Amino acid sequence: MTIAVYPGSFDPVTNGHLDIAARASRIFDTVIMAVFDRPNKQLLFSTEERVALLRESTRHLPRVKVDTYSTLTVDYVRSVGASVIVRGMRAVGDFEAEFQLAQINQTLAPDIDIVLFMASHRYTFFSSSTVREIASLGGDVSWLVPGPVVEALKRAYGRR
């Protein structure tokens, strides 16, 4: 059984994240979407909120599980018995950062493979920070994020 970990802050989870998770779950037996709990990072949603939103948003993906971690990613991957780290890339700009991160992780843990998924065309142009900015200005993000996230963003920015 192959377990893969898809780490991220998921602040908030987007349809692009869910697309990567769904595609990874067709290849791996289990995909753990691991929410990185970084108290020193400026986040809109708490770790608990991000986990709840992810769980609600992945109910339709039976092979996808949700967890949190606050250690080195490779240490977490080992602790759950996984052998693969899943990452998504939207555009060429992501390649440099993902390449450097992959090199670091492979140096720290040569036994863990890194699998990069290219974002589906319709998800290449936005990120969680783009979603937050649009939502903060009152824009419609329902085409970028799952329903539970739309409602959470409205609450976070005081809109109904």
UniProtKB/Swiss-Prot annotation:
Site (Transition state stabilizer): H17
Source superkingdom: Bacteria
GO biological process: coenzyme A biosynthetic process
Assigned GO CC terms: cytoplasm
Residues binding ATP, per UniProt: S9, F10, H17, G88, M89, R90, E98, Y123, T124, F125, F126, S127, S128, S129
GO MF annotation: an example: pantetheine-phosphate adenylyltransferase activity
Keywords: ATP-binding, Coenzyme A biosynthesis, Cytoplasm, Magnesium, Nucleotide-binding, Nucleotidyltransferase, Transferase
Catalysis: reaction(s): (R)-4'-phosphopantetheine + ATP + H(+) = 3'-dephospho-CoA + diphosphate
Keyword Cell inner membrane: no
SUPFAM superfamilies: Nucleotidylyl transferase
Pathway the protein takes part in: Cofactor biosynthesis; coenzyme A biosynthesis; CoA from (R)-pantothenate: step 4/5
Obligatory cofactor(s): Mg(2+)
InterPro entries attached to this UniProt entry: Cyt_trans-like, PPAT, Rossmann-like_a/b/a_fold
Enzyme class: transferase
Pfam families: CTP_transf_like (PF01467)
Enzyme Commission number(s) from the entry: 2.7.7.3
Binding site for substrate: S9, K41, T73, R87
Cellular compartment(s): Cytoplasm
Function: Reversibly transfers an adenylyl group from ATP to 4'-phosphopantetheine, yielding dephospho-CoA (dPCoA) and pyrophosphate.
Quaternary structure and interacting proteins, as annotated: Homohexamer.
Sequence similarity: Belongs to the bacterial CoaD family.
Protein name from the UniProt record: Phosphopantetheine adenylyltransferase
Recorded name of the encoding gene: coaD
